[in-house]
């Protein structure tokens, strides 16, 4: 079975050269959480592993928006809701599509901002028309974004994060959300160890291998 040895050297170097330590940390948190949620849902090890890869790379499209995003850091608007930044999931797909990643990984990244009720982007998919990997990333991405410090606001307490997510439950697959809740209530640590630098954590992820099919 053909495998990808690692993200291409060019892509890896671009990730590590970016002054986006918060984005790197966000990717690690989403990756770890997505793996555990997939496990909780009973998915096989191959799918769980591919979800970990997709979680780490889900925002890689922001590489092409880096200058714009950095210029918006003092803007009180929520960056993820700016129309221009909504291109990042499609851009991420374009960056990775010729690098040997499986359709599972690519579609999870492309559709990770689709909402279960059809109100998301880039294609306004709804329900089971959204790939399972993307439905898992959707929940994990929102949780990680709300529970971590971001350029435009401080991290929220865990109870507040869960309350806000429940208020927006229409965005999520209920089966996935309930599995996510079970994982969170088990008390897993989805941050990065204090003694581990973001760069070192990113290097360990960018050398992961995965089957293309």
Which residues are covered by each model-predicted region?
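Histidine- and acidic-residue-rich, metal-dependent catalytic cores
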Residues: 2-202
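Conserved small/polar residues in nucleotide/adenosyl-binding loops
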Residues: 205-212
């Amino acid at each position: 079975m053909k495998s990808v040895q690692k993200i291409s050297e060019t892509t890896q170097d671009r990730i590590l050269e970016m002054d986006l330590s918060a984005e790197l940390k966000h990717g690690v948190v989403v990756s770890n959480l997505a793996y555990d949620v997939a496990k909780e849902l009973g998915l096989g090890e191959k799918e769980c592993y591919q979800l970990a890869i997709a979680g780490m790379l889900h925002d890689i499209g922001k590489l092409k928006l880096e200058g714009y995003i950095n210029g918006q850091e003092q803007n009180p608007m929520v960056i993820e809701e700016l129309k221009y930044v909504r291109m990042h999931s499609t851009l991420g797909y374009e960056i990775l599509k010729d690098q040997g990643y499986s359709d599972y990984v690519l579609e999870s990244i492309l559709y990770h901002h689709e909402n279960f009720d059809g109100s998301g982007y880039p294609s306004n998919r709804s329900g089971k028309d959204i790939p399972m990997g993307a439905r898992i990333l959707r929940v994990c991405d929102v949780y990680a974004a709300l529970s971590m410090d971001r350029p435009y606001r401080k991290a929220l307490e865990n109870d507040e994060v869960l309350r806000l997510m429940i208020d927006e439950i229409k965005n999520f697959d209920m089966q996935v959300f309930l599995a996510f809740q079970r994982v969170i209530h088990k008390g897993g640590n989805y941050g990065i160890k204090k003694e581990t630098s973001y760069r070192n954590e990113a290097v360990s992820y960018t050398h992961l291998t995965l089957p293309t099919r």
